[in-house]
Every structure is written in structure tokens, then in C-alpha cells.
Amino acid sequence: MTNGGAENMLVDIINYQVKHEDVSLLVVNDLYDESIFARLNKRCQVKMLKRDVGSKNPFVILRLNAYLLTHHFDIVHLHNVDMIKYLFVKCNYVRTVHNTNQIYHNYRWHKGIIAISDAVHDELLGQGIRNSIMIRNGVNFRLIKQRNDIHTNCVFRMVQVSRILFVQKGQDILVEALAKLKDKGIEHFHLDFIGTGPDMQKLQTLIYENGLEENITLLGNQPREFIYSHLCDYDLFIQPSRFEGFGLTVAEAMGAKIPVLVSENEGPIAIIDKGKYGFAFQNKSVDACAKQIEYVMNHYPSQKFIDDAYEHVTKLYNVEVTAQHYLDLYYKIVPIC
């Protein structure tokens, strides 16, 4: 339960569902963010197994299965792609598939498979999994502070929020794109990276090698409250992912009423409706990313464009709708008496 988009959304979903049903949360690894649990409704029962990350201790697996065996849950909802291979208690399993580029996984005993986007749903179909349903991810937009004015900063302020993981999130593409802008003499910009991850040291090195120490700040991991309060301070949100099943942070930025620039892949391009509500660049292309950043700097979108994007995203990706669709699926699997 780290401070990621899926984890934060899960807390929002639980907080909605505990109003209607008894909900428990089982956390396997001893890796969690206190700010996540601080937001969790106290009516949710939490069980911590405190497994060391990477541990193969069979006792943890036994405790996991014993917990399921003794509690007789009507639904067991999995959010981890590998979890089912450690479970030998037959239950009504539901799984949410949160990303693309996933290899085929075991779906034994599953009564429901949820794809978070059309891209994920299509990939599952390509793997021969035809019984998945699409339930869009959701955001609690009421908590996000909105920007009320058009770009006025002397320095063009950009932000990128995600796990620091080059192979998926593409932070290296963004840094190299900004280096190209600086080589052209464009220097009136600043980028904040929010998040941590396995490539943090590589990111620091890349920034230094490109002479961008004055233009880029690494803010590290920040609680969601901080992010939701400060997204509105920026002129542009950028998501340069190489692949992405959805892109929750893109929706959040649109909810803050700031323009977004995304790579042309899967989830993010669907959120902006293929460019109707945001800007896009060719996936994996440093040159295209740099070109689009410069374009937005010189052709900043109108307030109407930003307002239309806000209306689009808040209508389509409301977390209470997501949570209710989850409940509706559960009730189909286990009918209410």
C-alpha cells in the first residue's frame, strides 16, 4: 500500500463501500504509506501480514489462506496480478487488472475480471479472456483544488506525478526533451517530479548530465492532499509513459483545470479523447515531446478548452461511480437475499 494512484483510489472505493457493506482490507507486504491509512474509514477492518518484500516465507502464505478460510468472505477482490497463485482457498475471486503489457496470468476461481480501460480490456481479449468487463477508474474530484486563471507565470511551470520507473513512466523521455528545449535557448521553464521509485538515482544522474539542475526539482513522495492542493499551481501536466493502462494522474490534473500533455498510448490518450481535451505526442519520441511542450508554451489553451476538459473528465471518471459499479458486480456474483 504505497502512495500510488491505484492505492489511493482503492481507499476512496473502500470509503464508499463501507457505507453499504462490511469491508476488510488485507495488506500482505510490510510496505505501506501512513498517509494512505490515515484516510481509510475506521469501519474498514485492516489485517496486516507484514511480509518482507521479496520474501518466500511459506508461513506468510499459510497465514494468508487461513485468514480467508476463517472469515468466509462473500467476495475476495484482488488488485495484485500474482496473488492468485498463492491462494488455495476457493472463494468468489474478483480481480482488477490495472495495466497493459501484462503477461497472461492465472484466473482460476475468478467470478469477475475488471479492466480499468478499453486498452486493458482489448489486451485481455487478445489473450483469450472474453469475460472481463470494463469499469473505469475514478477520482474524487471534490478534493482537488482548481486553477481559476489562464497561464500567467513568468516561468512556465510543469509537473509530472508518478512512480519513478523509466521502463513504464518514461521520465527519461521528458528530461531529454527539456534538454533539447534548453539547447534551443528556451530556458524559462521549471519541472517538478513528484514521486519515488527504483530509477530515482538514474533520474538524478540524467538531470545532472543534461545540465538541468536549475530547471528540474525532485519533490519525492508527497501525500495526496499535497498533490491535490498544488496541481493548480502549474501550467502543464506531462505524462510521458511508454505504456499505461489508464493514467489516473492525468485525470486528476484535468480535475485541477490545468492542461495535460500525454504520450500517444493506451489509457492516457483515451482520457483526453485522442486530443480533444488535451495534447499528445508520439509515444517514446523525445523530439515529439519537446516539440509539443514548446507548442503549448507558445499557444496556451483557452479557458473554454480547459473547462471543457474538466467537464469531460469529471463526468466520465467519478470514483463514486466506480465504487458503485464494483458493488453492482459483487451483487451479481452473490445476489442479495
Which ranges hold each PLM region?
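A short, well-ordered alpha-helix in the C-terminal region of glycosyltransferases
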Residues: S302-L316, H325-D328, K332
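Short hydrophobic beta-strand element within catalytic cores of glycosyltransferases
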Residues: P259-V262
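N-terminal strand-loop element at the rim of the active site
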Residues: M1-G4, N8-K56, G197-D199
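Aromatic "clamp/platform" in nucleotide-sugar-dependent glycosyltransferases that forms part
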Residues: R242
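Nucleotide-activated donor-binding/catalytic signature segment of Leloir-type glycosyltransferases, i.e.
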Residues: Q204-Q222
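Conserved acidic donor-binding segment of nucleotide-sugar-dependent glycosyltransferases
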Residues: K274-G275, F279-V286, Y295-Y300
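Carbohydrate-associated surface elements
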Residues: A119, G138
